[in-house]
């Protein structure tokens, strides 16, 4: 009798485990179509920034000029979800971008505010003489622990700098509520959320994987000359130096990972901070800094889980970076930020009246 009970218990356990196992290898959960010219392998770690799309333009062609659109970095909560903040402030077209933070659950959120570049004594601000390789400044996305990704809820005058996305510990991704390039953070669950303002706030990451963006974002460091003029370096990787006469100059050297090349689709950079949502793309598979799989789950939300990805996931592969520098799944580079309280969750489809189309701009992450 005891032996029979043991067999029954074992059978039930096996059935339970089978219920959580993917019906097929998760790496095959990919769209049938691919993005023309998309890059499925990217050599360096990168983040994402939320860039609103004009509703009057077509979804596939809307996008791009950094100077004409506001960008907000997505944040990620620990559960892997990705969220954008609810507000967006105007951002500038400078070469540095606020980094995205990640919360423990994997969610991604963007910060709520972004700081402007420092001004010199006489108040003048000047850019360096090199502009060909400079990348646009984008706010980094933070990740919360759950892996979710969310975008912020409000948008101000758009500019080329994007708010960073944060990630929570669960993998969710969230963006901030303002478009002034608020950084995205990630919470521990992998969710990605953006802060309430997109003013390029830096993104942090909570233990659950969610990504959240900090409430403020710093702009590229500016150098100052003795006469009070302030000059911005062409890249944010190098610290500004000071000459004996009091002038402050930025070094000409830049890190190899941040330097733009003719074949590099990513033209924006952001400062990386603790908790910043960091992603890697290899063979069409997107992973966050904790090795969780970027996927479109059953409710069409973009978040990080596993591996393996969440049961019922629709797509877990087929990611790429488009020639315009946007993240794409299959042949689609248009995502939707849908209002959820003070944050936007990110989806690959329009799921309700509170949703607006966005691009998820890839941004190189640098140490500042």
Curated annotation (Swiss-Prot):
Molecular-function GO term, any one: structural constituent of cell wall
Gene Ontology cellular component terms for the protein in this record: extracellular region; fungal-type cell wall
PROSITE patterns per the UniProt record, alphabetical: PIR_REPEAT_1 (PS00929), PIR_REPEAT_2 (PS50256)
UniProt keyword list: Cell wall, Cell wall biogenesis/degradation, Cleavage on pair of basic residues, Glycoprotein, Repeat, Secreted, Signal, Stress response
Main location per the UniProt record: secreted
Signal peptide positions on this chain: 1-18
Biological process (GO), any one: fungal-type cell wall organization
UniProt site (Covalent attachment to cell wall glycan): 81, 107, 124, 148, 172, 191, 210, 229, 247
Prosegment location in residue numbers: 19-72
InterPro entries in the cross-refs: PIR1-like_C, Yeast_CWMannoprotein_PIR, Yeast_PIR_rpt
Ranges occupied by PIR1/2/3 repeats: 71-89, 97-113, 114-132, 138-156, 162-180, 181-199, 200-218, 219-236, 237-255
Pfam families: PIR, PIR1-like_C
Post-translational events: Covalently linked to beta-1,3-glucan of the inner cell wall layer via an alkali-sensitive ester linkage between the gamma-carboxyl group of glutamic acids, arising from specific glutamines within the PIR1/2/3 repeats, and hydroxyl groups of glucoses of beta-1,3-glucan chains. The propeptide is cleaved off in the late Golgi. While both peptides are secreted, only a fraction of the mature glycoprotein is incorporated into the cell wall.
Site (Cleavage): 72-73
Function of the molecule: Component of the outer cell wall layer. Required for stability of the cell wall and for optimal growth. Required for resistance against several antifungal and cell wall-perturbing agents and for tolerance to heat shock.
Domain comment (free text): The PIR1/2/3 repeats are required for the covalent linkage to the cell wall. Their number varies among different strains of S.cerevisiae.
Family that this chain belongs to: Belongs to the PIR protein family.
PANTHER family to which the protein is assigned, alphabetical: CELL WALL MANNOPROTEIN CIS3-RELATED
Protein name listed in UniProt: Cell wall mannoprotein HSP150
Originating species: Saccharomyces cerevisiae (strain RM11-1a)
Lineage of source species: Eukaryota, Fungi, Dikarya, Ascomycota, Saccharomycotina
Primary gene name: HSP150
